[in-house]
C-alpha cells in the first residue's frame, strides 16, 4: 500500500470513528490542543513545589497513604479548603464515619457547602462517588478511606467468614468504571489509604497499602505522609513534624520530599514552611537563634518568627512569592534519589 493510500485509509477510519463516537474522540497527538495541567494547591508550600506543578492535578486519581495519625485527613481537608477558595464544589465520602466538622471548619473548609456522605458499604460509597463524578458539577471528591470500603458480602456474612480479595476486586472494578468519568469531568478524586504489614517479607519494605494493587496503577500521584517528630511548648505537645514523599508522579518527576509542621487545632503551619524554605534558599538569614529578612531581624527562635509572620502577612506573602519563583532549587535540594515504588 502506497503512502497516499495509507493516508486515505487512515482518514476514512478516523472519519468513521468520529461519526460513531463524536468529534474529538480520536485525533493525531499533534492536533490535540495543548493545555497546561491545572492544579489545586495542597495547602502546603513545600508539597506544592515537590509535586512540580504547584499542587495536585485536576482530572486525576490521587492516593494519600500513611500510618495512623500521620496527617492524612488533615492534608485532604486543606485540599478541600484550597479548592473551595477557587470556587470549587467538593464532596467527602466518609466511609470511616469519623469526620469532625469543627476541625474541618478550623482548617478553612466551608462546611455549609461541603457535600458529605456516610455510606454503609463499599459498593454504596463507590456508587455515590461515581454518580457525583458523572454529574460534572463536582471539582474534588475525597474517599476516606480505602480500608473502610467494606464489600456488602463481608458485612452480610458471618464473623470469621473468608472473603478472599473481595475488597481488591471491588476496587479494581470501581476504578475501571471511574477513570473515564474522572478524566472527562476534570474531577480530582482523592483516596485516603492505610498501611498494612505483609507477612513473611525477608527483603525490602514489608509495608503495603490496603485494597489490592489497582489503585497503585490508576493513581497519577501517590503521596506517602509520615509523622517524624513532635513539636512541644515546654512539656505540652502542640503539633507534629511531618514528612511527605511523592512516591509516584505522572505529571512531574517523582521522589521529591517536603517537610512541614501540623499544629493541633489549626493544621499545616504555612509560616513554618516559609521560614524553613526561606532559610534553605538564603532568602531568610539565620544567625544562631535569630532570623533576619532583608537585614532586618524578625525574631529570635522559630516559634517567635512564625508568630511574627502571622502578624505581618504582607512580609509572609512576599517571602512566599520569592520561594515559589526559586522553586526549582528547592526540588533539587529535596530530591530523594533512593526512593523506589513497589508496584
Swiss-Prot record:
Keywords in alphabetical order = ATP-binding, Cytoplasm, DNA damage, DNA recombination, DNA repair, DNA-binding, Nucleotide-binding, SOS response
Q: GO terms for molecular function, please?
A: ATP binding; ATP hydrolysis activity; ATP-dependent DNA damage sensor activity; damaged DNA binding; single-stranded DNA binding
Q: Which annotated residues bind ATP?
A: 66-73
| SMART domains cross-referenced by the UniProt entry | AAA
Write out the GO biological process terms.
DNA recombination; DNA repair; SOS response
What the entry lists under InterPro entries is as follows: AAA+_ATPase, DNA_recomb/repair_RecA, DNA_recomb/repair_RecA_CS, P-loop_NTPase, RecA-like_C, RecA-like_N, RecA_ATP-bd, RecA_C_sf
Q: According to the UniProt record, which cysteines are disulfide-bonded?
A: none
UniProt KW DNA-binding keyword = yes
Q: What are the annotated GO cellular component locations?
A: cytosol
Q: Which family does the record claim for this protein?
A: Belongs to the RecA family.
PANTHER family, alphabetically? MITOCHONDRIAL DNA REPAIR PROTEIN RECA HOMOLOG-RELATED, RECA
This chain belongs to the protein called Protein RecA
